[in-house]
């Protein structure tokens, strides 16, 4: 993800492996219909209680772009992303339309596979209750 928290989290591993961090915009956090942070938090809290099919087309398009990015990975990789994006990927992999499947903790590792042109979940990351902002 191009967002600061994901890039900062990726840096120690990139330094250890002596490689560059590639930025993939499609795995950034879900865009919200407002730039106001308080309104975004309220929108996201409401949205997280529902399903993808209840959201505006822009959110569904974002989710499909994220899935397409994951399916396009040609080899094993590590992707540093965010709560909603991880849930979107897990939901797509398990055919679950809920926005919130689980609550991945900060820096937890969720493992997906994109073999045979479809996503599947190999392991969910450690969970923790997270404040949505």
Feature names for model-found ranges:
Residues 1-52:
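Phosphate-coordination/substrate-recognition cap region in phosphate-metabolizing enzymes
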Residues 4-5, 93-95:
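Short beta->alpha connector loops
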Residues 40-54, 118-131:
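A polyampholytic, Gly/Pro-enriched intrinsically disordered region
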Residues 47-74:
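Internal catalytic-core helix/loop-beta-alpha segment
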Residues 75-84:
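Generic beta-sheet signal
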Residues 96-120:
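Domain-level recognition of soluble alpha/beta enzyme cores
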